[in-house]
Amino acid sequence: MANKELKRGLGARHIQMIALGGTIGVGLFMGSASTISWTGPSVLLAYAICGIFIFFIMRAMGEMLYVEPSTGSFATFGHQYIHPMAGYITAWSNWFQWIIVGMSEIIAVGSYTKYWFPDLPAWIPGIVAMVILGAANLISVKSFGEFEFWFAMIKIVTIILMIIAGIGIIFFGFGNGGDAIGLSNLWSHGGFFAGGFSGFFFALSLVIAAYQGVELIGITAGEAKDPQNTLRNAIQSIIWRILIFYIGAIFVIVTVYPWDELNSLGSPFVSTFSKIGITAAAGIINFVVITAAMSGCNSGIFSAGRMLYTLGVNGQAPKFFKKISRNGVPLYGTIAVLIGLAVGVVLNYIAPPKIFVYVYSASVLPGMIPWFIILISHIGFRKAKGAALDKHPFKMPFAPFTNYLTIAFLLMVLVGMWFNDDTRISLIVGVIFLALVVISYYVFGIGKRTQANLTKSEQAAE
């Protein structure tokens, strides 16, 4: 075992597909109705508004990655351009978010497998999926990329087919005796803003959560071939991804079905495919949901392992986390993530259910921390680089105004979470988690260790 470099094993097709579908989770296929119930058809506007600010976040990250493509991505930028504690908080927040995502996705695999094998204990397919994905991540970054490529492909094809089917139903009457449904469902059941301003405002916190994980592509920077061009192309296309895969799918759902009947329909995807005569729709979507869950877990193992590696490199976690295997994989970081997932899955079946409600809730706010850090560190990055950025081909539009505007929007979403009884617990538990991370920074003397590690690095460079 040697402390080598991470291998650049992710090609352009891997990066593009991770960017296109890597963060589309189970929620879009199965849980979109609950979000729509808050606000009605105006959820379309909520997705569009959130999508614009996500675009700014990604462009800020892209501008920095073009100059400094590193595995630590936003954690490294926070460390360099804000304060070492900012990098520490960001890395642990991202690690925690992806551990929780991975746990929930593994549990989802077990639950959805019961569609075909109702008597099979749910933990068995979950553990099998985790072992397969764990092995793929340990073998090489390319094997992670191959799994994610095909998982994303399945999700993307399903969404595109669903949008095509929906357009056929809306404008040509497919599955409806030739009678086009039209667009009336967008306003005929209580109006476009059926949930009122408060419903729309509260829905923003649920919609913004649907975009969490979109920054995953930044973590691939240290292992991408030709990172400048592949990441630039992937990030530049994000606005089209948002329009097609999020807004396009939601448009079909709220146009084909009255929004106030969605909760009784089950999955809108199943209903749409069934409507045009695909009798096996439930089984097909169940398979897609399992692949979406495995994709989320796969991304979680990759991302959380790289965050532990970054913490090790920065002197903010045990040194062994920065050890690299012969295959160019952060071995101990990945193994630690797999152990954490396994423990979490076991505890899910033996611990009181309420404990995991709090654990899952705690991941929402930490999941937003990387966005704040990207925006703030980008301001410091601009100041540090100065005139060197004049010829940068990939600059964030209207910075730093858009930085401050996006930060204000994210803070407004957090305020909305506080005033909503259903999301307040997420904010409270998330703040407690972040407070514990800050306390650990001082209790364990992370600042001194970081400075000592920086001094050693500077001496080695001389």
Swiss-Prot record:
The keyword Transmembrane applies. InterPro entries: AA-permease/SLC12A_dom (IPR004841), Amino_acid_permease_CS (IPR004840). Disruption phenotype: Deletion of the gene confers a weak resistance to growth inhibition by serine. The deletion of the three permease-encoding genes aimA (ybeC), ybxG and bcaP results in an unprecedented resistance to serine up to 100 mM. PROSITE patterns: AMINO_ACID_PERMEASE_1. It is a multi-pass membrane protein. Signal peptide: none annotated. One of its GO terms (biological process) is transmembrane transport. Keywords: Amino-acid transport, Cell membrane, Membrane, Transmembrane, Transmembrane helix, Transport. The keyword DNA repair does not apply. It comes from the Bacteria. GO terms for cellular component: plasma membrane. The chain crosses the membrane at residues 17-37, 38-58, 89-109, 121-141, 154-174, 190-210, 238-258, 276-296, 331-351, 355-375, 398-418, 427-447. It is found in: Cell membrane. Probable threonine transporter. Is also active as a minor serine permease. Belongs to the amino acid-polyamine-organocation (APC) superfamily. This is Probable threonine/serine transporter YbxG. It comes from Bacillus subtilis (strain 168). The lineage of its organism: Bacteria, Bacillati, Bacillota, Bacilli, Bacillales.
